[in-house]
Amino acid sequence: MVRMYETIVIVQPELGDDELKGLTAKVTDIIGSFKGVLHRLEDWGVRKLAYPVKKSVRGRYYYVRFDGDAPLIAELERRLRLDDKVLRYQSVKLEKEAAAPAPKAAPVESAPAVEAE
């Protein structure tokens, strides 16, 4: 059964452009080989980690949103686990309602302040 997933991948911040392109190519190849559909692959840049991971205090974040099934997730996570460049990853199954962006809230007008006596 095809479901929508999102995965956050944190890699070592000092990787070169060729290594980063290789990592993103590997992720897209895995999704394509399991007949998944890639919706979004974003580089969120280098950010400070909440705590040191494998002696790194910073990491480069990638966001991946795709459609796939359970064998695709299992293979993607297996390959990420074996890659030494990957510090952490997390995959989450999305609900159908979460696929659409939330509507924007209307601006709130503030009432004039009343002076205290």
Swiss-Prot record:
Molecular function as annotated in GO: small ribosomal subunit rRNA binding; structural constituent of ribosome
Keyword field: Ribonucleoprotein, Ribosomal protein, RNA-binding, rRNA-binding
The organism's place on the tree of life at top rank: Bacteria
Pfam assignment, any one: Ribosomal_S6
InterPro entries referenced in this protein's UniProt entry, alphabetically: Ribosomal_bS6, Ribosomal_bS6_sf, Ribosomal_S6_plastid/chlpt, Transl_elong_EF1B/ribsomal_bS6
Function text: Binds together with bS18 to 16S ribosomal RNA.
Family per record: Belongs to the bacterial ribosomal protein bS6 family.
HAMAP family: Ribosomal_bS6
Protein's recorded name: Small ribosomal subunit protein bS6
Organism annotation: Geobacter sulfurreducens (strain ATCC 51573 / DSM 12127 / PCA)
Source species taxonomy: Bacteria, Pseudomonadati, Thermodesulfobacteriota, Desulfuromonadia, Geobacterales
